[in-house]
Amino acid sequence: MQSAHYTGRFAPSPSGPLHAGSLVAAMASYLDARAHQGRWLLRMEDVDEARTVQGAAQDIAASLSQLGMHWDGPVLVQSRRQQHYQRACAQLGERVYACGCTRKEIADSRLGMAADGAAIYPGTCRSGLAAGKRAHALRVRVPEPGQALEQIDFEDRWQGWQRQHLASAVGDFVLRRADGFWAYQLAVVVDDAEQGVTHIVRGADLLGSTARQIYLQSLLGYPTPTYLHLPLVTHADGEKLSKQNGAQALNLNRSLTLLHEAARFLGLEVARVDGVAAFWELAVLAWRRRYL
């Protein structure tokens, strides 16, 4: 019997096939949902259409199925939801403004880098575009230091207590990019709210984005989910394993071995079994014992 109080999701970017790092994230989100007797959704985060690889979404879904991870309901695809993001942006009203700054101009302000690697925005276009400047992107204002919602606090189930000052850590951030694509921060907030997501389990590379997402949730009147940010699977040099730096596609002929390796990374002891279904039964129990 599924719980009406838990909805989780796995939301990969279809820029390539599943690899060891994305398997860990998928497994953890799946186990947390099933251990809570909740729903587990699948979303394809292809809002950045320039990075989308043709056929990757279908490959990811097929791989999850072969590995025994079966989602509830239809797959949500971000690239089909442009009007939803437009409506949310319009709802923010005067908090949104056009920005004509180039990446170089922002970097030249030397305010440092946000946790996601983007340069901290100095607020150049807050009071309007300078003469001769053309709008490139849309940004949302963050509060000045000391104002309500400038400091975002939340408890992460894995990483513990978190605090971020939006003004100094990121500045006014992008909602629609210069290339016309909606930014991840807005799209993920809208999708989580409209899908009723209550619990988010994902990699720690997104921990630094969470305060911005909580801020947007507050502005839009959305509930804030519970967060768990996992340690990242890395190369030997410590760099995050990703499609962009050569992570190898999973060999699904080794499905059980792959599942056991991912479980060990998550600190789970799962006895050797003969089939995928039996693995998941034991893995759900192991997750429940350790993390609930």
From Swiss-Prot:
One of its GO terms (molecular function) is zinc ion binding. ATP binds at residue 243. GO terms for biological process: glutamyl-tRNA aminoacylation; tRNA modification. GO terms for cellular component: cytosol. A motif ('KMSKS' region) lies at residues 240-244. Coiled coil: none annotated. Zn(2+) binds at residues 99, 101, 121, 125. Pfam families: tRNA-synt_1c. Its EC number is 6.1.1.-. Its cofactor is Zn(2+). L-glutamate binds at residues 9-13, 45, 184, 202. Signal peptide: none annotated. A motif ('HIGH' region) lies at residues 12-22. Keywords: Aminoacyl-tRNA synthetase, ATP-binding, Ligase, Metal-binding, Nucleotide-binding, Zinc. Gene3D superfamilies: HUPs. Binds 1 zinc ion per subunit. NCBIfam families: PRK05710.1-2, PRK05710.1-3, PRK05710.1-4, queuosine_YadB. Catalyzes the tRNA-independent activation of glutamate in presence of ATP and the subsequent transfer of glutamate onto a tRNA(Asp). Glutamate is transferred on the 2-amino-5-(4,5-dihydroxy-2-cyclopenten-1-yl) moiety of the queuosine in the wobble position of the QUC anticodon. Belongs to the class-I aminoacyl-tRNA synthetase family. GluQ subfamily. This is Glutamyl-Q tRNA(Asp) synthetase. It comes from Verminephrobacter eiseniae (strain EF01-2). The gene is gluQ.
